Design a protein with these regions (language model features):
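Bacterial Sec-dependent N-terminal signal peptides
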Residues: 1-23
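Solvent-exposed, well-ordered amphipathic alpha-helical segments
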Residues: 3, 15-16, 93, 122, ...
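N-terminal hydrophobic or amphipathic segments with adjacent small-residue motifs
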Residues: 7, 14, 32-34, 90, ...
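Mobile, glycine-rich extracellular loop/lid and propeptide segments
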Residues: 28-46, 93-94, 98-100, 105-122, ...
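N-terminal processing/targeting junctions
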Residues: 12-18, 71, 75-76, 99
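A post-motif C-terminal structural segment
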Residues: 29-30, 39-45, 49-91, 138-472
Length: 472
């Protein structure tokens, strides 16, 4: 009897070993590469803590990608700085080489171009998509198709996009679509064989007959802000979303090549909210990207042996600290913020214009209660109320001190409101810029076991290329 039991155990062990080998031996046909711009370790942990706090408990409520079975953490320094910018980090994630801050797709000599994993995928016969929640010519997406010594060369980067021969692009718009004496980037895009669609509904109408797609937000949305899609916390019903972009990309790339595709998806405004030190908005952006990852995860479940999903970040933004006093967190307070900091600034400007000299402190207090929970769900100190009142007086007197960050400008009242909420929730910040913190790497699917331990950001595209069979 003992002999039979031992034999059975050995057979089970052998079967498990063979199954594990089979699971790791597959070559992925479908590669998803998600990049959360500015999404460091604490942005992920903080979001999960926030989700649990909203349910009234201590702990975490996992994001789907944080439960992926294979994980690593990556260094992010550039060739020129201990703290990278998005151009150098995007280039490292795209082509596996370090370069200097501000550089897109070139070696540190600022001359030698380096092809990206998207190009390697295209040359291997895969359909290719590059997408983002910010502009299509911004640093991270540009790193996959452009070669420019300065990330601010937006018109030239747009020209590189047109000549890339990739199948699908998506983002808010072009930042600089026009140049005197030259064709607009819209015209150049169409001349290169792309069908421009505005919004998800128009994509659904026109995609079937299109050879290549450039998916942008509606013209009305771009008139309001062409630089990015609205923050998730500010989103209105008809706004284009990262989930819609991901769904459209999968649909179109499968149409182009049912057997093989590569898709990069960037959650670009995690970083922007980090520059603003706006925790509520950061966490809602991370949740928004997680929802896009869920779309890819649904695809993976239908093709588990043929799909690889990588989720990582280019750098951490803000030096987010999860705790600023004693051992207590009050992340549940963050749910009472209803707008991003810049959106609330615009909202206050409209109120000032509406009421003029008749704007009272009581009106402002009621608005702060409605949009931040102050004096109701969120208790604030006498000193904090005095700070807010002083900002109100400054607005009335026309001496408001506006605050400016990398991507935003807002009045002092909105700045103080989000700062007080962050402080009371027990969130700290060390910077209004990037930091040198490790970034997480999560992986699931064919070849995902190659993601483990401490790696560098330049290792990630090399690992993907190796397991997917792309020639570098």
């Amino acid at each position: 009897m003992t002999k039979h039991i031992l034999t059975l155990i050995l057979l089970l062990a052998l079967t498990t070993h063979i199954t594990a080998q089979d699971a790791t031996a597959h070559t992925p046909k479908y590669v998803f590469y998600f990049i959360g711009d500015g999404m460091g370790m604490n942005q992920v942990n903080g979001t999960e803590t926030y989700l649990a706090a909203k349910e009234g408990r201590i702990g975490i409520k996992p994001l789907c990608f944080a439960d992926f079975p294979h994980t690593a953490f990556a260094t992010t320094f550039s060739s020129s700085h201990g703290i990278t910018d998005s151009a150098a980090a995007g280039s490292a994630l795209a082509n596996g080489n370090k370069t200097y801050n501000g550089c897109i797709g070139l070696l540190p000599d600022s001359i030698t171009p380096v092809s990206s994993i998207a190009v390697w995928a295209r040359e291997a016969g895969a359909a290719v998509g590059i997408s983002t929640s910010v502009s299509v010519d911004h640093a991270t997406p540009a790193a996959f198709y452009a070669h420019r010594k300065n990330r601010n060369m937006y018109y030239e980067i747009g020209q590189d996009m047109c000549s890339s021969q990739f199948d699908f692009f998506a983002g808010s718009d072009f930042l600089k679509p026009e140049r005197p004496g030259e064709a607009s980037l819209y015209q150049q895009t169409q001349d290169a064989g792309y069908t421009i669609v505005r919004g998800y509904k128009e994509y659904q109408k026109k995609a079937r007959k299109a050879d290549r797609i450039l998916m942008l937000q509606t013209e009305e949305a771009s008139k309001n802000d062409r630089s990015a899609l609205p923050y998730a916390i500010d989103r209105q019903k008809d706004d284009m979303t990262l989930v819609q972009i991901t769904k459209a990309a999968i649909d179109f790339l499968r149409k182009k090549n049912p057997d093989r595709f590569f898709l990069m998806v960037e959650g670009g405004k995690i970083d922007w909210a980090g520059h603003n030190n706006d925790a509520s908005t950061v966490y809602e952006e991370v949740i928004d990207m997680d929802n896009a990852v869920r779309v890819a995860l649904d695809f993976y479940r239908k093709h588990p042996n043929e799909t690889l999903i990588i989720v990582t970040a280019d750098h951490e933004t803000g030096g987010m600290g999860l705790g600023n006093k004693n051992y207590t967190l009050q992340f549940d307070l963050l749910q009472y913020q209803k707008m991003s900091t810049p959106q609330y600034s615009n909202h206050i400007s409209r109120i000032v214009k509406q009421y003029g000299d008749s704007l009272t402190w009581e009106i402002i207090k009621q608005d702060l209660t409605a949009n931040f929970g102050f004096w109701d769900k969120v208790k604030i100190s006498q000193q904090q109320e005095e700070q807010l009142y002083k900002a109100y007086e400054d607005i009335l007197a026309g001496r408001d001190k506006s605050q400016k960050t990398l991507y935003s400008q807002f009045n002092n009242l909105s700045y103080l409101a989000k700062s007080i909420l962050n402080m009371n929730a027990r969130i700290g910040w060390t910077s209004g810029s990037h930091t040198n913190g490790y970034v997480p790497v999560f992986a699931i699917g064919a070849g995902a076991h190659n993601i483990h331990g401490r790696i560098d950001n330049t290792d990630i595209p090399k690992i993907i290329a190796k397991v997917a069979g792309y020639r570098r």
